[in-house]
Each structure stands twice: as C-alpha cells, then as structure tokens.
Amino acid sequence: MHSVRRRGLGAAALVLAAAGLLAGCTSTQHAAKRMQLDSARERAAQLSTRVTSANPLITATRVATVSGGGATAFVVTVHNGSRRAATDLPISVGYSLPGGRRVYLNAGTTLNYFEAHLPAIFSGRSSVWVYTANAELPRGARPFALVGSKPAAPALLTETNVRIRLTWTEVRAGTVRIKLDNPTSVPQYQLQVYAYAQRSGHYIAAANATVVDLGAGSKQSLTLHLVGEADGARLQIEAIPTILQ
C-alpha cells in the first residue's frame, strides 16, 4: 500500500512539474512573440507609408481636422465593414490641393509606428484614430485619409479583452494630465492615447500620444497638449491597446 501511494504521489508530482514547465514555456513563448511583433513594427516605422489605393471594406468614413499653433490634428473615423477583425493596416493622411495633387503628411520615416498604421478594429465596428501633423493646412486644401489593405506587421488578435484604465485632469487650458493603469498580464508596447472634443458635431480639439512601454500590472503618467481649444466641451480620452496576443 505504501509503495503504491508513493508511486501515486510521485506521478502527481511529475504531472504538476510538467504542467508548471509547460506554463512557463508558454509564457516565455508569448513574451517572445510580443517582442518580435514590437520589433517588426519598429522596422516598419522606418519605411515611408503612402497609401494610394483605398481598402474597399475598411474605410475612413469621416475625416476631420483641428488646427492651431502651427499644427493640425486629424481625427479619422474608420469603419470595418469586413467579416474579420483587422490590425496594423497602413493609413495615410494629408490634403489635396485645388489642382488635385495630394500632399502626404504622415509618410515620414521618423514617425511612431501607429502614426501611420491602425490599431485593431473589429468586424462591424468603427473607431477613431488621431494623428497630429506639425503644420497647418493651406487655404483651399481638402484633408483626406486612406486606409490600406495589407497589414504591415504579423499581429495576432488572441487576447481581445485587454483594457487599459485611465483617469485624467486638465491642469491648465489645453493641457491634460493622464494616469494609465494596465491591470492585465499583457504588456503594451506603443500603446496609443487619443483625445478629442466635439461641439455641435464638429471637432474642436484633439491630440495623440504613444506610450512606448506600459508593462503588465504597471502604471504610468503622461501629459497631452491639445491642438485647438476644448472650451468646456466634453473631452473624450481613450487608451487603445496595441498588443492583443
């Protein structure tokens, strides 16, 4: 009896040890894949992005701009009319001149990755993407936004319930202090923070920021400087997860 019990305990211990090793191995693999994705995005950011042919299913349904202080914030509503979630699609913004020539404003090779690419957008959903250009549009120019069809990095969407908590206070007119909290086990690289305000259906202020690394279970603060003036309008601020695998 004793020898049988010892064998049973030994077998159970082996199973637990194997399960622990498997969990550790899986966790290590997940971490490695996330780092590989971040590296792929960093490499893609070093290439110029110019979308010339629009995606027929994932489209920019609204393109608004807010100008002030020598800058222009693009606030783009993107709708995913396809049957699948999508992520890492290229997006180009700029303006068209009266003669029809397009000027691209986010085609540089020194931008953060998500200043020329979209975070995840799920099937049938719409989301807002914000980009700030260090230039005001010339008179008569018409803003445009084009979403591409081919993802720039091989991201997976297997952890779709990731949510980043945030609180914010306006420390002075046009300046917002934001506190971020990642309560999940999924670290966020190049996390996107978007802020925008509307009045009577028109955007009157906007800003965006990239948080390079918000680790699992960690907190971080940042300051946003708005383009335009919110002037008491309701300011909406979103922290958009970029690692969902």
Where are these regions (language model features)?
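Membrane engagement elements in two modes
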Residues: 2-4, 10, 14-177, 181-190, ...
